[in-house]
Amino acid sequence: MRKQVEIFTDGSCLGNPGPGGYGALLRYKQHEKPLSAGYRLTTNNRMELMAAIAALETLTTECDVVLCTDSQYVRQGITSWIHNWKKRGWKTADKKPVKNVDLWQRLDTAIQRHSVRWEWVKGHAGHPENERCDELARAAAGAPTLDDTGYQAE
């Protein structure tokens, strides 16, 4: 039987682009594991993606996951848009390269061994786990230590 895991995620960017961070909280039964990291120059969408990626990549066995994000970009992208992006060779409907393709591909790989149900929660609306992830993300953004090597200025 697979483990039932809840994941909560959030990304933050101080300026967009600017210093950014992600926060994630993994919960299995009574155990919780917070994750966060800060990047010197990135975007809010990249940090939202990184939160989900980091959390999923932390799981060591196949799991049934409920992943809660306040990012419609992440939820819509992974449940809907990604199918056509892949069919078109990672191009949008108007034949432009998909933004953040490095992270979309990494997220696509990260979900393969798990059963993931994506849930959207309204950000900054008092959802306790989302608020905790927001605090982790903002703290990480305020003290960035990493380079987002995939970030490309437009």
Curated annotation (Swiss-Prot):
GO MF: magnesium ion binding; nucleic acid binding; RNA-DNA hybrid ribonuclease activity
Keyword field: Cytoplasm, Endonuclease, Hydrolase, Magnesium, Metal-binding, Nuclease
Cofactor needs: Mg(2+)
UniProt keyword Nuclease present: yes
Keyword Amino-acid biosynthesis among record annotations: no
Self-association state and partner proteins as the record states: Monomer.
Protein name: Ribonuclease H
The gene coding this protein: rnhA
